[in-house]
């Protein structure tokens, strides 16, 4: 199984906690939504910040553009319905969600945390790394993938290939 790279859908996943930076992602999505109103973002997870994040979504007028969704048993189905995965963490370890998304051919846009994302994503080859906590650049890189379907497709293919290096038989 692999992604529907042509869908107008981006996803993120993780706990609704400060570390995950979903507040920054929602702010970035406000910029994306102005340029690409046909695109939607779904953030899968649970946690203490859900009400605060929903309030931010409402205040930014993103009610129909950005959805907070419950954690699902099979996130693979959600990867397959999306064209872009976004990791907005302030800090991150290995970032298993990145490797999972890449395994389904979903190109990723991520903050360049010192560990994890910078070790997984090969910038401009199988995904895009963004200066840590730079909301405007995050929005810009998401828009770049939206605007460049062929780049998105190629990065998705490379993501599937490059993530193989993390498979148990190759570690």
What kind of feature is each model-predicted range?
Residues 76, 83, 105:
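A short alpha->beta transition loop at the rim of the catalytic pocket in nucleotide-sugar-dependent
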Residues 150-171:
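A charged, aromatic-enriched C-terminal amphipathic alpha-helix characteristic of glycosyltransferases
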Residues 95-98, 117-120:
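Short glycine/serine-rich donor-binding loops of glycosyltransferases
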Residues 101:
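Donor-sugar nucleotide-binding helix/loop cap in glycosyltransferases
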Residues 71, 90:
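Aromatic "clamp/platform" in nucleotide-sugar-dependent glycosyltransferases that forms part
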Residues 8, 12-31, 43, 48-54, ...:
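A conserved mid-protein helix/loop that constitutes part of the nucleotide-sugar donor-binding site
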């Amino acid at each position: 199984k692999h992604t529907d790279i042509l869908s107008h859908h981006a996803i993120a996943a993780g706990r609704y906690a400060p570390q995950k930076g979903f507040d920054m992602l929602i702010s970035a999505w406000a910029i994306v939504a102005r340029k690409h109103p046909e695109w939607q973002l779904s953030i899968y997870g649970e946690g203490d910040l859900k009400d605060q994040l929903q309030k931010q979504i409402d205040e930014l007028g993103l009610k129909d553009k950005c959805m907070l969704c419950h954690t699902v048993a099979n996130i693979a189905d959600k990867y397959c319905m999306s064209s872009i995965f976004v990791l907005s963490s302030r800090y991150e370890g290995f970032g298993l969600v990145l490797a999972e998304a890449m395994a389904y051919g979903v190109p990723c846009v991520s903050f360049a945390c010192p560990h994890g994302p910078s070790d997984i994503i090969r910038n401009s080859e199988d995904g895009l790394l963004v200066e840590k906590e730079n909301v405007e650049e995050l929005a810009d890189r998401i828009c770049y993938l939206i605007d460049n379907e062929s780049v998105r497709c190629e990065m998705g293919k490379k993501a599937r290939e490059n993530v193989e290096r993390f498979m148990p038989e190759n570690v």
